[in-house]
Amino acid sequence: KWGGALFAVGAWIKVWPAGLLLAALVALRARGAVLAAAVAVSMLVVATGIALGGASALLTPITEQTGRGLQVESPVSTVWLWAAAAGEWAASVYYDQGILTWQVVGDGSQLAADLMTPLLALVVLVIVSLGIVAARRGVDEVELLPVLSLALVMALITVNKVGSPQFATWIAVPVVLGLAWQAWGGPSFRVPAVLALVIAGLTQLVYPVLYGSLLALDPRMLVVLSARNLLYVVLLAWAVWHLIALCSRPRVVSSGVAAGAAAPASEGASS
């Protein structure tokens, strides 16, 4: 219950914890309590916003997202950064005064920006569907929650036209959860932990250490950023692969259901 409340508070502050909340609603048996706590927090936030005259701003984190271009650090922007360095596709890096961030523009960049939000929604829907299948097949929440949380968080990072150094810190939550739950029979999270550390190191190089070189399209920094973004994709693929593996397991039948099914068979044998 308290986890649902905390995830809801986090989602209203920074959006991405909504992925953790969604994973909890799918994977945990106590999803009713999680949902009730999240709804209670959300109602309190909405009521407070309306009371303070900020009703029109409640959904700005989502509505403002749709109008953005391709931010420099997002994985999808990598192609246009290399094109800008090569003098192709009329690509260039510019500073958007409206939202105070560096973005990339070039042939096809606006189409890519327009497609990223619906693509992100589709990827999240697919991941949640896999999680529901795994839960219905009786996969234990100790195994399902860390993998599903990581998959959703990595989708929010990887399939996103927005990029930021803080995104690398998001990975810590599902990775720490996975490492902690290994002791209770959860899957090994050594690979995600190592990848997360490498991603953090590369991100530190990108920003703030050598960000000026990146904006100047220094090929060495483009290699660093490309490697970091590729590792985002690898980590997403790892999580989805393990999620599919959980879905592929034979269905687990609870002991109560199994006992109920066995009773008629034993009665028939005795008669």
Predicted regions, residues:
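Multi-pass membrane glycosyltransferase architecture that uses lipid-linked
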Residues: K1-T63, A112-S271
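Juxtamembrane membrane-water interface segments that cap and precede transmembrane helices
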Residues: E88-L111
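Short helix-capping/linker segments at secondary-structure and domain boundaries
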Residues: G87-W89, Q182-A183
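N-terminal leader/capping segments at the start of a protein or of a new domain
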Residues: Q65-R68
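Extracytoplasmic catalytic/substrate-binding loops of multi-pass membrane glycan-assembly enzymes
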Residues: L70-V76
